[in-house]
Design a protein with these regions (language model features):
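A conserved mid-protein helix/loop that constitutes part of the nucleotide-sugar donor-binding site
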Residues: 1-17, 31-38
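Nucleotide-activated donor-binding/catalytic signature segment of Leloir-type glycosyltransferases, i.e.
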Residues: 37-55
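Short alpha-helical donor nucleotide-sugar binding micro-motif in glycosyltransferases
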Residues: 54-55, 62-67, 88
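Short alpha-helical segment that forms part of, or immediately flanks, the ligand-binding pocket
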Residues: 61, 84-89, 103-105, 111
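Acidic donor-binding loop of glycosyltransferase active sites
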Residues: 65-79, 92
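Short hydrophobic beta-strand element within catalytic cores of glycosyltransferases
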Residues: 93-97, 107
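A short, well-ordered alpha-helix in the C-terminal region of glycosyltransferases
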Residues: 135-142, 149-164
């Protein structure tokens, strides 16, 4: 299913039942939009789930700066997922599936983001992955319960992007890699751009 929009909606239902105060904004559109809206109605979470549609990248970056948490629920079919870099750079806590390509390289679980167990690619709206849903719900509930911890993770996420994954670091690492290749040495870049990521 790739994006797994059912997971945030089901998570919203779980957290609402437990008394949490939040709003879930869902951005974008696609093949599962109508199913997603139907699920929201079926679960009675219209008051906490808003469909915001598609917008320009600049507008989306502004929206990220207004939010505390970014849910990235895709499965192993996602690839790198540049939106992970973008939300971290804009000060969101990234709560991401462990199957997204960039997650092992960008996120240190509990330090600069949160990682939950990915939903199986074979799951669907009718047959959601309960283990993934419970893990996602637990991570978000922890963040909502620990505002100070959430702020620390947001700060660390932004620092990771500014210090380790910045354009300046990318240029430095590229020069280091070129030098190593020209001189027949193995690259010593362990993390960030030009690493084995």
């Amino acid at each position: 299913m790739l994006k797994h929009p059912e997971l945030p909606i089901l998570m919203a239902h779980n957290l609402k039942k437990r008394g949490y105060n939040f709003v879930l904004d869902m951005f974008g559109s696609g093949a599962y939009e109508e199913q997603s809206k139907k699920l929201v109605g079926k679960l009675g979470v219209e008051d906490v789930v808003r469909f915001r549609g598609t917008m320009s990248n600049d507008a989306l970056m502004k929206e990220m700066r207004k939010h505390d948490i970014f849910l990235f629920t895709s499965d192993c079919n996602e690839g790198w997922g540049a939106v992970a870099n973008e939300c971290m750079a804009n000060g969101c806590v990234l709560v991401a599936s462990d199957a997204i390509g960039s997650v092992p390289y960008l996120v240190r679980n509990g330090e600069n983001g949160m990682v939950f167990m990915s939903a199986s690619a074979k799951t669907s709206f009718e047959n959601p992955d309960k283990t993934a849903l419970d893990d996602l719900s637990g991570k978000v509930a922890w963040l909502l319960d620990h505002k100070d911890g959430m702020k620390k993770i947001q700060h660390k996420a932004a620092c990771t992007m500014q210090e380790l994954w910045s354009p300046k670091r990318a240029a430095q690492n590229l020069l280091t890699l070129i030098d190593a290749l020209k001189n027949g040495r193995e690259s010593l870049i362990e993390e960030g751009p030009c690493s084995k990521a």
